[in-house]
Amino acid sequence: MNAFATAFQVYVAALVFARVGAMVMTMPGIGDQAIPARIRLSFALLMALILAPLVQNTVGPIPSTLGGLGGAVIHEVLIGLMIGSVLRLFMTSLTTAGEIISMQTTLSFAQSTNPSMEGSSTAVATFLSMLGLTLVMATDLHHLFIAAIVKSYTIFPFTRAVPVNDAAALAVQTVAQSFSLGVQLAAPVIVFSLVFNLATGLVGRIMPAFQIFFVASPLSVILGLSLLALSLSGIAMVWTDRYRELLDIFT
């Protein structure tokens, strides 16, 4: 019995680690490539060791075949990837807002490395992405990440099949909402750009000899960034509230 109990405990811990590890590797913040792999692995292992005794009563017997064992592990990995990917997809709303703001203020050429996107983006998009990660930590949203990991075993127990259709629908909905939110967050700068371009067009039409381009470009950058600075508090509050609503689905 002792040998069976030990084998069963290892089996449960492996399943929990498969789900938690997949979630941690795809979640915002802790799952970024900028975080050393050892830290991410250690965090996932610690969470697995904590959760394994709590959920072992809901786990079925150890499969008698290698295929059954592999299927159980893949099942857990897919659920972890589903939850973590949805949480990361919503982070693109800030990147979208930053890209739109950069286009409206003629700053699209200013590229920088964006750790959260694992690639390059405009400087404004990178700044807003870093702002999002800061807000996650400052407003304790990362606690809801941990709550989502724990609650996932109630929403998606070991015996339930992977909800592929629901996961695909949620991913599409999250992408649509993140893009819509990105446009909304950039709305003040979009309105400013429309008014500013209309005004400069009228000035250029009235005074053709006036070199409007040399005045409009720096003025667009200064006024656009000033408006962004004034809008940051509103952007932070709206984005945090919307992200909290998304996390409520899993908590």
Curated annotation (Swiss-Prot):
It is a multi-pass membrane protein. Pfam families: Bac_export_1. GO terms for cellular component: bacterial-type flagellum basal body; plasma membrane. It comes from the Bacteria. InterPro entries: FliR, T3SS_IM_R. One of its GO terms (biological process) is protein targeting. It is found in: Cell membrane; Bacterial flagellum basal body. Its main location: membrane. The chain crosses the membrane at residues 10-30, 43-63, 67-87, 130-150, 183-203, 212-232. Keywords: Bacterial flagellum, Cell membrane, Membrane, Transmembrane, Transmembrane helix. Role in flagellar biosynthesis. Belongs to the FliR/MopE/SpaR family. This is Flagellar biosynthetic protein FliR.
